[in-house]
């Protein structure tokens, strides 16, 4: 085994004011001043144009020097055996071999210990347990560090991936989402507060609700929260907890809200791997409703590089949206997959749409790109899909055990 393993039970006026903000921009506008500027601009009008003007003015005025670079030596990664978490762990081990990671994961249906195979022992301690277990979480900062202090430095940051995330499941039973996404986040925040640990919270663009299909607007850090379903509501609640612990307790926090990810290790219940594995398993792909809903796709590797950038260079107390300008509607994505896998463009079945399904997500990542210098590397979506298809084709033993049960669950739901 390639790591330590611990088992636990575990308009006009707006235009003039925006110009004034541009002309008076300084190199040191603090967050409170930024917030005041936002409010003055937005209060002048209820229109989306006012909000866009506020965004632009604050981006121009916000030239405050970033925090000194943060160089963590030991990170607690919650949910590190899941889809995005595992990709993050692999990426950190590959690109920052001096960093040790303690992965805390409950190994629910969507997480697998084998997702971390190949991570060097020097980089990884695996703990099987639940983030809602406050005693276990506390032991990671006391007992674990005491036992391994000679070899592993103390935990200096938490990167919090652990979450229930599948919308369909939240519609059937929201309780695991409230427990993990809200209570679990609270437990981790309290541990971080007690030990003065930096805390990066992984969230979703779904907290902002959805956008109309025919409008050019995208989500920004100033977009209002309008969650549409139980999953996004639970993530919105967790975001607010993180902000409250920063303001009330002075906890060093950052938040990232990302668009839809694709890539290796994603469970077959998700849209892209479901279509790919259906074709590989000889099942006709399934498309919710007419397939006109738009998602903003990003490679999971790009998402993980953005997280590292925010963790190490982001300003404390700030939120950063992560996206790669990858807007496609679902039917076009499915037809890309069909083409790449040598199938007819109409070789799929329409099934019942998801109740309350969101129309469109779209991320404006300007703040992350201009303030921290991050940019996506994998911008050819079709090329990324081809690589993802290759991964699932080569890892049938990884996904096949989950396939039949997942499709049966969808069949019962009419999907």
Predicted regions, residues:
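Short histidine/acidic/glycine/proline-rich micro-motifs that form metal-
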Residues: 107, 260-263, 293-294, 354-355
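C-terminal substrate-binding subdomain of Rossmann-fold SDR/epimerase-dehydratase oxidoreductases
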Residues: 46-60, 68, 72-75, 88-91, ...
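Structural element of the ATP-grasp superfamily
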Residues: 188, 242, 275, 368-369
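The catalytic Tyr-centered alpha-helix of NAD(P)H-dependent dehydrogenases
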Residues: 227-234, 264, 268-272, 296-300
């Amino acid at each position: 085994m390639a790591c330590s393993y611990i088992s636990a039970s575990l308009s006009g006026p707006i235009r003039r004011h925006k110009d004034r903000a541009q002309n008076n921009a300084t190199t040191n506008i603090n967050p409170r001043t930024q917030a005041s500027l936002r409010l003055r601009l937005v209060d002048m009008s209820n229109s989306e144009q006012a909000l866009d003007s506020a965004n632009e003015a604050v981006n121009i005025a916000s030239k405050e020097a970033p925090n000194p670079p943060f160089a963590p030596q030991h990170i607690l990664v919650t949910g590190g055996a899941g889809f995005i978490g595992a990709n993050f762990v692999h990426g950190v081990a590959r690109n920052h071999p001096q960093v040790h990671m303690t992965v805390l994961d409950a190994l629910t249906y969507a997480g697998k210990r084998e997702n971390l195979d190949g991570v060097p022992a020097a980089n990884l301690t695996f703990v099987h347990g639940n983030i809602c277990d406050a005693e276990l979480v506390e032991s990671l900062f006391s007992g674990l560090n005491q036992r391994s202090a000679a070899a592993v430095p103390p935990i200096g940051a938490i990167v919090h991936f652990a979450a229930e995330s599948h919308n369909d499941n939240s519609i059937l039973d929201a309780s695991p989402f409230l427990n993990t996404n809200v209570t679990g986040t609270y437990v981790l925040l309290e541990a971080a507060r007690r030990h003065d640990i930096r805390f990066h919270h992984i969230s979703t663009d779904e907290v902002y609700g959805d956008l109309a299909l025919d409008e050019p607007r995208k989500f920004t850090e100033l977009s209002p929260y309008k969650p549409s379903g139980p999953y996004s509501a639970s993530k919105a609640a967790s975001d607010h907890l993180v902000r409250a612990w920063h303001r009330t307790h002075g906890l060093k926090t950052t938040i990232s809200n990302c668009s839809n990810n694709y890539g290796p290790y994603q469970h077959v219940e998700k849209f892209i791997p479901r279509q790919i594995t259906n074709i590989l398993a000889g099942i006709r792909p399934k498309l919710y409703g007419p397939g006109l809903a738009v998602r903003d796709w990003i490679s999971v590797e790009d998402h993980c590089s953005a997280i590292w950038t925010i963790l190490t260079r982001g300003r404390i107390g700030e939120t950063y949206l992560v996206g790669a300008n990858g807007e496609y509607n679902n039917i076009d994505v499915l037809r890309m997959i069909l083409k790449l896998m040598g199938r007819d463009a109409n070789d799929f079945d329409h099934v019942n749409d998801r109740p309350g399904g969101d129309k469109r997500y779209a991320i404006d990542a300007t703040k992350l790109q201009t303030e921290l210098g991050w940019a996506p590397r994998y911008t050819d979506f079709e090329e990324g899909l081809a690589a993802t298809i290759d991964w699932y084709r080569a890892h049938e033993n990884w996904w096949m055990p989950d396939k039949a049960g997942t499709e049966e669950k969808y069949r019962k739901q009419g999907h």
